[in-house]
């Protein structure tokens, strides 16, 4: 069994709207394969506030 790790930091604030849903998809082509997400993390920060007066 071969194991692979994928890790990346992606600044999404400039490319996605305020509310999003995240999903995973993978395929080896025409053959069957099982994929497992062994860990997942997500971090979000509020970078500022606005108030209307």
Swiss-Prot record:
GO terms for molecular function: D-mannose binding. The keyword Protein transport does not apply. It comes from the Eukaryota. SUPFAM superfamilies: Concanavalin A-like lectins/glucanases. Keywords: Lectin, Mannose-binding. InterPro entries: ConA-like_dom_sf, Lectin_LegA_CS, Legume_lectin_dom. Heterodimer of an alpha and a beta chain. Belongs to the leguminous lectin family. This lectin specifically binds mannose and glucose. This is Mannose/glucose-specific lectin alpha chain.
């Amino acid at each position: 069994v071969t194991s692979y790790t994928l890790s990346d930091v992606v600044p999404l604030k400039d490319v996605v709207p305020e509310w999003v849903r995240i999903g995973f998809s993978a395929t080896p082509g025409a053959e069957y394969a099982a994929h497992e997400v062994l860990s997942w993390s997500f971090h979000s920060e509020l970078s500022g506030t606005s108030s209307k007066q």
